[in-house]
Amino acid sequence: NGLAEHYLSKRIGVERVMGGFVNFGADWLGAGEILYGNRGAVVIGEVDGGIQMRTRAMQKLLQCFEPNVLVTDNIMGYLWGKMCYGAMLFATALTGESMAKNFADPSRISTFASIGKEVIATAVAEGVSPESFDGFQPLAFMPDSKPKDFERCMTELSEFNSKSAKSHSGIHRDL
């Protein structure tokens, strides 16, 4: 999680940096004990948007973990999408309820909308086109979005998270 790809590229060279995005659920429970909660998107891409032989080699390597790993020419779009989703997960951590229940609760919709719109507006200002994944729809957070788009996004995020053995975010766990 994060947006360190450009920073790292400037420090160590773009040829030594590849962006990666994961959205599977997992929690460290203790020494040698990890809960794998659910499958989710795994996406890799070059910082400059190209697709190289090493990108395909990394895809092949990662397919032993996630057969549907994607290669993208817009890794920053996925990372900014995850930044938006992650910001909303911080809000879910402030309740005692599951991620799925939070996203399904109509009384929390305005909070998620405000958080998401701020992150997506920042991404767009940075020249990034955020990407969709696992129920997250960045178009729902655009200034010209319709309420039904946002409601559909919340429903899909709730459904995605309801199937996970990991009911609460890592942020909730850490708090």
Segment roles from a protein language model:
Residues 23-28, 82-89, 137-140, 152-158:
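Short, functional N-terminal and low-complexity linear motifs
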